[in-house]
Amino acid sequence: MFTRDMQIAGFDDALWDAMQQEVGRQEAHIELIASENYASPRVMQAQGTQLTNKYAEGYPGKRYYGGCEHVDVVEDLAIQYAKELFGATYANVQPHSGSQANGAVFQALVKPGDTVLGMSLDAGGHLTHGAKPNFSGKHYNAVQYGLDENGLIDYDEVARLAREHQPKMIIAGFSAYSQVIDWARFREIADDVGAFLLVDMAHIAGLVAAGVYPSPLPHAHVVTTTTHKTLRGPRGGLILSAENNAEIEKKFQSAVFPGSQGGPLMHVIAAKAICFKEAMEPDFKAYQQQVIDNAKAMAGVFIERGYDVVSGGTEDHLFLLSLVKQGLTGKDADAALGRAHITVNKNAVPNDPQSPFVTSGLRIGTPAVTTRGFGESECADLAGWICDILDAMQQGDASQAEADVKAKVEAVCARLPVYR
C-alpha cells in the first residue's frame, strides 16, 4: 500500500540531490540550446498523475485492454486540440519522440532500400533525415542536399538531385537552419518526381502554431514534430496531415501501433493536450514573436562584433555561429561559456573542418530565455557577453572574462527566474 506522503528525499538522497541540483542549474544558468525550453507547471502536473499507471495499447475506442474509458477521453482531447491548433485533418499523438514519429512515417511510406532525399547534418538537417549513423541512413538509400555559398537552401539543386535520384520521399525541415523554408517549392519538387513530402517541423512547431512562421500543413503529405522545443510541452512526438487521405492515415496509425510502439504514455499524452491548449492562448503568439525578435537581436550583435552567422541572420528561433574565422572550436567555446553559466551546444557548420565531436560552430536558440522573460535588450547584452568570452579565448586566456560574465548571468537569472 502507498501513502501520499511518500517522498524521494529520505528514500534515495543521492538521486534527490541530483534532481535538486538540476533544478538549481536551470534557474542559475542561461539556456540557449535551441531544442530546450521550460514546460509549464500544468504540463509537469499532467506527467505526474496516475495516468502513468494505465496501459492502453491501441487507439480510442479500439483498445486491447479494459478500463480505458477515461484515457480515451484524454487522447481524444489531445487529438482534437492538435488538429485545431495546426489546421490538420489527422493527428496521431502517440509517438514517444520526434525521431519515432519520423520512423513511423518512414515505415508507412517507404520500404528499406528506397531512396530518400533530406538535408545533411552539417547543413542543419537531423539524424533522421538520412544521416549515415541513423536508421534513415542505414536502411534507406539516403541522398543529402546542403546549402549554397550564402548558407541558404538551393531549391534548384534540390530539384536537380530529385530528378537525378528519383526519391520515394523528400524530407524538408531542420534542426539548425535560420531562414524561412519555401514549403510550396518543396511540394512542387516532390510532385515533379512522384515523391512523398515529409516536413519535420520539430524546431518551429510553436512558431507555426502562433502564425509567425509559414505552416507546412497545406503543402506536405505528412508533418512530424516534437511537442517540446518551441511548443513548450512534454518530451514527445506528433504526426499531422491535412491531406484528407484515409489510406495514408491508416498506414500512419498502424506504423505507430503496432508497427513501432506498444502502449502509449497516457500521462505524456495528457501533457501534450495541455501544451496544445496553452498554445491556443493569445499570449502564446506574443511569446513566439518575442522568440524571433530575441534571436534577431542576438544575431545582430554577433555580426556587429565580427562573427559569422550562417545564412547571414535569422528569421526563426535559432542561428548557427561559425567560429572558423576565429580559429576556435565549438567544443572549446561550449565549455568556456558553460563555465560562465551560459549553456549552448557545439554544432557543425557547412564545410566544417572539424569532426562532429569537436565542430567549428555553436547553435544558439532563444525559446528558453524568452520563456523566462528575456527581451531584446537582455538578449543583446547576452550576445555581447558571449562575444567577450570568445574574444578573450582568441587572446589565450578567457578566465577573467568567464568570471565577469558569470556574475552578470547570476544577476539577470536572479531577476528573471524560470518559475516564480
UniProtKB/Swiss-Prot annotation:
Enzyme nomenclature, EC number: 2.1.2.1
Keyword annotations from UniProtKB, A to Z: Amino-acid biosynthesis, Cytoplasm, One-carbon metabolism, Pyridoxal phosphate, Transferase
Compartments it resides in: Cytoplasm
Residue numbers bearing the N6-(pyridoxal phosphate)lysine modification: K229
One GO CC term on file: cytosol
Residue ranges crossing the lipid bilayer per the database entry: none
Keyword Cytoplasm: yes
Catalytic activity: (6R)-5,10-methylene-5,6,7,8-tetrahydrofolate + glycine + H2O = (6S)-5,6,7,8-tetrahydrofolate + L-serine
InterPro entries associated with the record: PyrdxlP-dep_Trfase (IPR015424), PyrdxlP-dep_Trfase_major (IPR015421), PyrdxlP-dep_Trfase_small (IPR015422), Ser_HO-MeTrfase (IPR001085), Ser_HO-MeTrfase-like (IPR049943), Ser_HO-MeTrfase_PLP_BS (IPR019798), SHMT-like_dom (IPR039429)
GO biological process, one term: glycine biosynthetic process from serine
Record HAMAP family: SHMT (MF_00051)
PANTHER family: SERINE HYDROXYMETHYLTRANSFERASE
Cross-referenced NCBIfam families: PRK00011.1
Family: Belongs to the SHMT family.
Assembly mode: Homodimer.
Record's protein name: Serine hydroxymethyltransferase
Species this chain originates from: Chromohalobacter salexigens (strain ATCC BAA-138 / DSM 3043 / CIP 106854 / NCIMB 13768 / 1H11)
